[in-house]
Amino acid sequence: MQARYSVSSPNSLGVVPYISSDQSYYRAAAGGGYTGMPAPMTMYSHAAHDQYPASMARAYGPYTPQPQPKDMVKPPYSYIALITMAIQNSPDKKVTLNGIYQFIMERFPFYRDNKQGWQNSIRHNLSLNECFVKVPRDDKKPGKGSYWTLDPDSYNMFENGSFLRRRRRFKKKDAMKDKEDRGVKEAPSRQAQPQAREQEQSVPGSQPVRIQDIKTENGTSTPPQAVSPTLSTVPKIESPDSSSSMSSGSPHSIPSTRSLSLDSAGEQHHQAPAQGFSVDNIMTSLRGSPHSSGELTPSLVAPSRTGITPTLSLNYSPNQSSVYSSPCSQNSISTTSNATYHCNMQAMSLYAGGDRSGHLGTTATTVDETLPDYSITTTTSSLSHGNLSSAQEGHHPHQGRLASWYLNQAGDIGHLGATYPAQQQNFHSVREMFESQRIGLNNSPVNGNNSCQMSFPPSQPIYRTSGAFVYDCSKF
């Protein structure tokens, strides 16, 4: 076979088979010997092609028109799905048997043939499945056959609305049973909702304090709060302008303020959460006008920077110095000016001892004249004092102990109080107010003799005298 064709022939590679008419893969002399060769071997040769009958088709001949394969493929839907499609496609959600046939043949060309077979299956499925309900025809609409529709409980028999998969075979009794079970489960929940609503309406909730009521505290209105009998009978200490001393004052003076302040503080502490405690309530109360005579809650009066037990705040006026019944009430200053000593350097100089009382009195007086006559915000950290005459200083045995507590450092740092801005004392954080209320009410010991007994660590110096102008009161 290799000797019968030329290797040097350009057509031997099979690239261009139809270059010449007299040359082919096989020589003409041997043409008759290869009549039995298969067609793929002779399709490139004119001489070999002529030896075969004309009915032999070429490999690349044109195809005759054939029907598309997709038209003849059976749809992947069951007969139940086909009937459901026809019913849901109708405007009235009901269709006759002939309408089902027409819908299926229009949508799926596969069912255009062999009508007898699949139409019989459609009728069987309509009769045997409970999901299809037969509806009699009305007399007003003449025609042949009855309508078929879907049972209302069978609309969800296909998964996610896809007709390719059905959940399960629909049965009317199962559907009714499921409906009853759902009704039993939903009944308690429906009954519980109205009862809960009635309980909410019958039990009035505690309404929080409105911001409008808080902001108009300066004289028009005050936030609604329950007034306890103790708060309604708050004693008022006489003006310090008079020469009467604290110990010889009214029966509601310093010796009796400890029990009164603690009791009222406890009651106010329990009443505070009912008002809707908020930061706005704190700040607006701190910014209260001196012309209003409102009481401060223990969380506001608590001296957060000194660790002293918070006491009951008293009424005040611009012409009277705010004298708060703090346990530290034995210090004495003979002055006629309105003074409120803050938690700064010259306030600590009150405890230097009896030998320096004269010098300290003049220093504190000159410094406090620059301060306002009233200061609500600074009273949270103030050390209240009683205005006793200088002649009564020596009669108090506590001055020696106070001098030993404060290490006689107040004389050296007393002059620093004038340069310390009072405005920096007016901004206390909310955390300090809460901490002072918690620590002050529970941990600070108070002596019945009105002596200032503050719990400081004995191993650390009380005050720093290394030239620091700011004293960290919240350190302790």
Swiss-Prot record:
It is found in: Nucleus. Residues 169-271, 284-303 are annotated as: Disordered. One of its GO terms (molecular function) is RNA polymerase II cis-regulatory region sequence-specific DNA binding. Pfam families: Forkhead. The keyword Transcription applies. This is Forkhead box C1-A. GO terms for cellular component: nucleus. Residues 173-188 have a biased composition (Basic and acidic residues). Residues 74-168 bind DNA. Coiled coil: none annotated. Monomer. DNA-binding transcriptional factor that plays a role in a broad range of cellular and developmental processes such as eye, bones, cardiovascular, kidney and skin development. Acts either as a transcriptional activator or repressor. Binds to the consensus binding site 5'-[G/C][A/T]AAA[T/C]AA[A/C]-3' in promoter of target genes. Upon DNA-binding, promotes DNA bending. Required for cell viability and resistance to oxidative stress in the eye. Promotes cell growth inhibition by stopping the cell cycle in the G1 phase through TGFB1-mediated signals.
